[in-house]
Amino acid sequence: MLLYVCLVNLLLPLSDGAVNPELVGVLVKVGVDAALQQIDEVWKGSTVRDWKCAVENKSNKTLYAMGTTPESGSMTTILDDIPPENTGIFVWEKSRGAATGAAGVVHYKYGNKVLNLMASIPYDWNLYSAWANARLSDDKVSFSDLYYGQNGAKSATKGGNWGEVDGTKFFLTSKSHAEFKVIFSGK
């Protein structure tokens, strides 16, 4: 199986000698599990809350990166386009020093539609749970709409369960360093 890995930036050491998990997007022509394992080998972050996502594009069109809508934290990798039959990877971390989780929406252009992927990893597991959602729509969808299942969005799926919406199958683990697996068929 061909493996295409595009690393635009490597782990950058901070002035105090610690490792800074500033990585680039990784584009891999393998399955979701192999892609997540690949990023584990290069990303050695020490954040309290984060989620890494592998988006497997099983459609016949390229998913064009459109950016993010942060709720808490931000993407720490470059969001790349994902050609058909390829897998794109990115990492989202909580804001450093803040008592918040890691939550936001990633947007990809798919033809004349937008694929919106939402994940939320809580700061306090005693009060909150991990949630994920997806929606293929005409425009970008807000975090709030995806989290609460409003304005046409389906209800979010609790971490530890498979969800399926608009040709998108996804699974978010319920742990502080979560894995968000997304399989997009475009159907």
UniProtKB/Swiss-Prot annotation:
Entry GO terms, CC: extracellular region; nematocyst; other organism cell membrane; pore complex
Entry superkingdom: Eukaryota
Keywords, in A-Z order: Cytolysis, Membrane, Nematocyst, Secreted, Signal, Target cell membrane, Target membrane, Toxin, Transmembrane
Motif mapping: Cell attachment site: 158-160
Family statement drawn from the similarity comment of this UniProt entry: Belongs to the actinoporin family. HALT subfamily.
Domain notes: Composed of a long N-terminal alpha-helix and a core region rich in beta-sheet structures. Before the pore formation, the alpha-helix binds the lipid membrane, partitions into the lipid-water interface and stabilizes the monomeric molecule on the membrane. Finally, it traverses the bilayer, thus forming the transmembrane pore.
Name of protein: Hydra actinoporin-like toxin 7
Provenance organism: Hydra vulgaris (Hydra)
